[in-house]
């Protein structure tokens, strides 16, 4: 596989550990939700998302009901766009207050910097909201890496397991699918990207998956333990 025209990467389990998201970010948002909803429910950036949750679930627009719904979604790792937007707002305070800094694998940091130096455009596609993605890379253990990226995509462009989402991303960045490499630890996402012609790499880190995964369709993708093994 030669140097691609652009690289699209997932975050959780790919550039960064699963445990940071599940053991630090998710519990932080869950704890903060009651106060956040009470203090910001009338804020113009918050109210539309709470309205969406209430309308979609038939939940009465009460603080208690909304918080209970959102906390259940956190517990089940829902990818709902409204939840991700609200989580991002909560995490912003955590980053700014120094409550935590984002984890990035050293091999990912090294390769991201090298690709940027080689003028390869880098993009993020994550279920987390675009503001949350930007905060993640701005407040990392390796410093502010947000400037390495040319663009950011979340589920507002479509679900990560839907091939049409990757078609929209390719059209947005103006590069044919065959010129893009997508990096992820989720086989269903890679399958969707491959359907429209993206080159795909399954990242199967031992820190996140102690036993190598033998997944259906894994042979359809380059299967590596880390960014250090990437051939470009």
Curated annotation (Swiss-Prot):
Q: Write down how the cofactor binds this protein.
A: Binds 1 Mg(2+) ion per subunit.
Pathway(s) of this molecule: Amino-acid biosynthesis; L-methionine biosynthesis via salvage pathway; L-methionine from S-methyl-5-thio-alpha-D-ribose 1-phosphate: step 3/6; Amino-acid biosynthesis; L-methionine biosynthesis via salvage pathway; L-methionine from S-methyl-5-thio-alpha-D-ribose 1-phosphate: step 4/6
Q: Which domain of life is it from?
A: Bacteria
Please list the GO terms describing molecular function.
2,3-diketo-5-methylthiopentyl-1-phosphate enolase activity; 2-hydroxy-3-keto-5-methylthiopentenyl-1-phosphate phosphatase activity; acireductone synthase activity; magnesium ion binding
Q: Which Gene3D superfamilies match?
A: 1.10.720.60, HAD superfamily/HAD-like
Q: Which UniProt keywords apply?
A: Amino-acid biosynthesis, Hydrolase, Magnesium, Metal-binding, Methionine biosynthesis
Q: Which cofactors, if any, are listed as required?
A: Mg(2+)
Q: Which GO terms describe its biological process?
A: L-methionine salvage from methylthioadenosine
Reaction equation(s) it catalyzes? 5-methylsulfanyl-2,3-dioxopentyl phosphate + H2O = 1,2-dihydroxy-5-(methylsulfanyl)pent-1-en-3-one + phosphate
- Enzyme Commission number(s): 3.1.3.77
Instruction: Kindly indicate whether the keyword Manganese belongs to this entry.
Output: no
Keyword Transferase (UniProt) = no
Family indicated by similarity? Belongs to the HAD-like hydrolase superfamily. MasA/MtnC family.
Relate the protein's function as given in its record.
Bifunctional enzyme that catalyzes the enolization of 2,3-diketo-5-methylthiopentyl-1-phosphate (DK-MTP-1-P) into the intermediate 2-hydroxy-3-keto-5-methylthiopentenyl-1-phosphate (HK-MTPenyl-1-P), which is then dephosphorylated to form the acireductone 1,2-dihydroxy-3-keto-5-methylthiopentene (DHK-MTPene).
* Subunit-level organization: Monomer.
The protein's name in its UniProt record: Enolase-phosphatase E1
Organism of this sequence: Xylella fastidiosa (strain 9a5c)
């Amino acid at each position: 596989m030669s140097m691609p025209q652009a690289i699209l990467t997932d975050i959780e389990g790919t550039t960064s550990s699963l445990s940071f998201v599940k053991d630090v970010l998710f519990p932080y948002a869950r704890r903060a939700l009651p106060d956040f909803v009470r203090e910001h429910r009338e804020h113009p950036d918050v109210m539309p998302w709470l309205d969406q949750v209430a309308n979609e679930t038939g939940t009465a627009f009460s603080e208690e009901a909304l918080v209970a719904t959102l906390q259940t979604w956190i517990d089940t790792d829902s990818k709902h766009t409204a939840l991700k937007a609200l989580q991002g707002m909560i995490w912003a305070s955590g980053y700014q207050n120094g409550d935590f800094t984002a984890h990035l694998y050293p091999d990912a940091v090294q390769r991201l910097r090298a690709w940027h130096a080689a003028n390869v455009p880098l993009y993020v596609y994550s279920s987390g909201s675009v503001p949350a993605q930007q905060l993640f890379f701005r407040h990392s253990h390796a410093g502010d890496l947000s400037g390495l990226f040319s663009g950011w995509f979340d589920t507002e462009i479509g679900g990560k397991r839907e091939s049409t989402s990757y078609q929209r991303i390719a059209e947005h960045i103006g590069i044919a699918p065959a010129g893009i490499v997508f990096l992820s630890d989720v086989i269903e996402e890679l399958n969707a990207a491959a359907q429209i012609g993206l080159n795909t790499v399954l990242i199967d880190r031992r820190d996140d998956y102690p036993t190598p995964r033998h997944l259906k369709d894994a042979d359809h993708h380059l299967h590596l333990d880390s960014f250090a093994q990437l051939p470009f």
